[in-house]
């Protein structure tokens, strides 16, 4: 287990730069979510969800928002700290960031 420059223990699942580069080749957009918990830093790597995954998560959200979050998390998670999925506080913190990453992007419409 490594420590970062702030002295926090880093839990990243042993993900390497080579893993990240491979994922970028497979998924185009890959992002890292860091969740600090006391003297620990939990790191997770995610990709953008497919339209099918977003539809599945939206369908589940009508009856159970937490289950919807689990669907999205599990479908986008590439690697990193398994504690992010198992610890409810870490999970909810990661989900906040994941929702930001997959949320609406800036767009515009122009009349021609």
Question: What is each of the regions a protein language model found here?
Answer:
Residues 35-112:
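Short, surface-exposed, charged amphipathic helix/loop patches that serve as local interaction elements
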Residues 1-51, 112:
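Short, charged/polar N-terminal "headpieces" of proteins
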């Amino acid at each position: 287990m490594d420590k970062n420059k702030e002295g926090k223990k880093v839990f990243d699942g042993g993900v390497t730069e080579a893993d990240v580069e491979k994922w970028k080749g497979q998924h185009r957009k890959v992002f890292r979510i860091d969740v600090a918990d006391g003297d620990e830093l939990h790191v997770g790597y995610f990709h953008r969800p497919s339209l099918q995954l977003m539809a599945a998560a939206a369908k589940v959200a009508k009856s159970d928002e937490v289950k919807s979050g689990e669907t999205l998390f599990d479908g986008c998670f590439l690697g990193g700290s398994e504690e992010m999925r198992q610890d409810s506080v870490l999970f909810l913190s990661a989900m906040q960031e994941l929702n930001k990453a997959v949320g609406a992007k800036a767009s515009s419409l122009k009349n021609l």
